[in-house]
């Protein structure tokens, strides 16, 4: 018999706590090790017991979810899935910063069993807990998660012909927000190319994610609008439940079927870049589940674009990068801290 995944639930609301116990306890993969009401209780329990994964509320009495994440990752590193309500910008900001501090993913708080979205939401919570329980987390200094920058980023390796590349496309899923903060921070405010981004994220968190990205990186992040002409200094994020594409150097918002079970899809973005700018594009596949982006990246590579996938050593989940590499779509496979250096080199100097 397969060993069950031990889950520690940290949630102060009695209603939500009981609902999480029901959702997780009804899945035969899990064992609810305990359900506590505060971060302090969680930390005390971790002194003597080790869950496989923690379901962590953000808004708690006393210590909030961000501070709890920092302490957990410095004292007793454990995979953390943040469970957040989409109620206000402050809660979303805390949730996103918890990712920077070492939490692995954010999911939406469950709704009542009679709600139309209950089954989908419950399945997503269980999927995230199961996947994240397998991630090998490491001890982090108390401030490490809030200090992503370019310190670990190698210097540019060469200079060549400016103007070879005109645009960067990025796709990310699980682990993406924290990876993007590190990557974009390493690019610097003088990075000369527009950036188009597909981030798989719960729709109710998208606007908060975009605001958070603007506040934590040198770039202005915004939800892409149909007909916009991308310019340097901005990150154009695919909107909720629509694909993002590029036609005649302008953004297009497409209401087409999902690709690789994703809408928006990185493959749609990359495919449009391959057709529109060919060898002048750069495509990057970051951490994430599934295979989205792999076929589109192959199309970019076939057109002579520069294609990069994140190395497994720095991925939270190595699904999408591995799928792209398996297709032969990756010109380079790089650990996350090296990707920014390579992008700067390409944008400012051409090919290596």
From Swiss-Prot:
Residues annotated with 4-aspartylphosphate modification: 57
EC number: 3.1.1.61, 3.5.1.44
Enzyme type, top EC level: hydrolase
Pfam families the UniProt entry points to: CheB_methylest, Response_reg
GO-annotated biological processes: chemotaxis
Post-translational modification summary for this protein: Phosphorylated by CheA. Phosphorylation of the N-terminal regulatory domain activates the methylesterase activity.
A GO cellular component annotation in the UniProt record: cytoplasm
Catalytic activity reported: [protein]-L-glutamate 5-O-methyl ester + H2O = L-glutamyl-[protein] + methanol + H(+); L-glutaminyl-[protein] + H2O = L-glutamyl-[protein] + NH4(+)
Signal peptide extent: none
Residue ranges of every copy of the CheB-type methylesterase domain listed in the record: 162-343
Record HAMAP family: CheB_chemtxs (MF_00099)
Domain notes: Contains a C-terminal catalytic domain, and an N-terminal region which modulates catalytic activity.
Stated name of the protein: Protein-glutamate methylesterase/protein-glutamine glutaminase 2
